Amino acid sequence: PAGMGGKKTVLVFVVGETARADHFSLNGYGRDTNPQLEKRGVVSFGNVWSCGTSTAESVPCMFSDLPRSQYSSGRAAFRENLLDILVRADVDVLWLENNSSCKGVCARVPARTTWEADDKRFCTDGECLDDLLIDQLRQAISANNDRDLVVVMHQIGSHGPSYFKRYTQDYRRFAPTCDTNQLQSCSQEQIV
């Protein structure tokens, strides 16, 4: 069903599971790390903790109904997740992937991966910048037939150790930078 007043509702859920909430200016960090997000009035959940340090653990946990203290991948595998509930509520769901995978969370919903697109504007050697997700989001919204839609965008974000490959020169704002995947060769100032 369409949202309030017959208009479709579009919710974009950005999964940046490698992002540190304490390094978001949206959450009070001293450096202006999220200027574009601040302009959009987004909701940042800064008081949230992951179930684990790996994508395989953290992503399924985010979409599980289990509390963090009771979460296990074995228990979650046999339960509905948030996306399943949305589909049962007659909401269209699309998963846009620019990370290693959805780790089973999107198994029962339509999903697209950036590496399938192989868009030369954003992709090099099989890795794509998160910017490509914006193009895919625009396509998904325009193709949607006036139905409520939830789009999950799973970013590569700040996955390391090749942090310097996660953004273009246009976004290089904080110097000095660590331009190698050999982090031991970089100073603390370059890394943070």
PLM features: what roles do these ranges have?
Residues 182-192:
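Active-site-proximal segments of metal-dependent phosphoesterases and phosphodiesterases across multiple
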Residues 1-13, 18-182:
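Active-site-proximal alpha/beta segments of enzymes that process anionic O-linked groups
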